[in-house]
Design a protein with these regions (language model features):
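Periplasmic polypeptide-binding modules associated with outer-membrane biogenesis and secretion
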Residues: 1-176
Length: 176
């Protein structure tokens, strides 16, 4: 786990190809110390090149670029790129997937693809499949023994017939 974290830090600093070549742990009884040696091969430092969006019809390139917040010439950071596209660690963060899913596009998918690596620069295409708009069909309360269902329905932010919104579903769950 620590080695994975170490490599992730390298990748955040532009070293996309960083890898652990060798590792060793040696205990020295005489001085009661442990020596840990990790040999890392950094590889080349990379930078973001051109980033193009494909398949987007609902949102403009400008809107998606401002949400992505990554400019040509910045140090490559694959971890940041993934967070700006879809941050699984924070369901209500501002990222491209949430932009789509908060506006009805439940089945949208956004995939970054490296299309060209030249010298130290990586060009990307962000391939977007928007899919159809999803609407809430039915909201059902189950397992409720203490409160009248009507009270729960009143507090929900989601209603049948509304466009799907991941944010509103999460808020409803939190508030209940």
């Amino acid at each position: 786990e620590d080695l994975t974290s170490l490599i992730t830090k390298y990748k955040e600093k532009g070293y996309r190809d960083a890898r652990v070549v060798s590792e060793s742990v040696v205990y020295d009884k005489e001085i009661n110390k442990i020596n840990i040696d990790v040999n890392v091969e950094e590889g080349r430092k990379y930078y973001f090149g051109d980033i193009r969006f494909l398949g987007n019809t609902v949102y403009s390139d400008q809107t998606l670029n401002s949400l992505l917040g990554i400019k040509r010439g910045e140090i490559y950071n694959g971890v940041l790129l993934q967070k700006r596209i879809d941050d699984n660690t924070s369901p209500d963060s501002e990222n491209i997937t949430n932009l789509y899913q908060n506006n009805g596009y439940l089945w949208s998918s956004i995939n970054p693809v490296e299309v060209k690596t030249e010298n130290d620069t990586i060009d990307f295409e962000i391939r977007i499949t928007e899919g159809p708009i999803a609407y809430l069909n039915n909201v059902t309360v189950k397992g409720n023994d203490k409160t009248n269902d009507r009270v729960i329905y009143r507090e929900l932010r989601t209603r049948p017939g509304q466009k799907w919104s991941k944010d509103q579903v999460i808020r409803s769950i939190r508030e209940l």
